[in-house]
Amino acid sequence: MKLKSRLLLSGLLLAVLPFAANADMPGKHPAYLHALSDLRAARWMLSHRPGDPAVSAQEDVAITEIDKAIGEIKKASIDDGKDIHDHPSVQEINDRPGRLHKAVELLRKVHGDVAREEDDPFTKGLRDRAIMHIDEATHAAEHAIGDVKNGR
């Protein structure tokens, strides 16, 4: 009886071992997961920055484009399951233009993360649309910076 139990336990261990080995393996597209995290952080910085109505309009455009970029990345099944409003802890930046500059910095980093070589034609299209939305968000945030500098 002990021999049967040991054999059964050994067989079960051998059956489960491959799954345990894959548990710590990084995902197929870790750069996209980093991009999702950075997009959420940029979104938070834009949405939690008090500003003038003209600047806020540009921030709204940037936030909308960030949401669209997140949607494109998630359509590619590169979804970490987090809520769009979930973001990594962000060091509080008190000056109003500081958050805009940090958001632009993050968006440029995201562009680099997402713009990597892609083999799957379906995913290429999603990647290209995500990049378009990221670039639009970057331009809107840059316009918001210009509005702050020009006192608009």
Regions found by a protein language model. Name each.
Residues 1-9:
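Bacterial N-terminal signal peptides that target proteins for export
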Residues 3, 18-22:
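General structural signal for secondary-structure boundaries
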Residues 10-18:
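Bacterial N-terminal signal peptides
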Residues 22-152:
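Long, charged/polar, soluble alpha-helical segments
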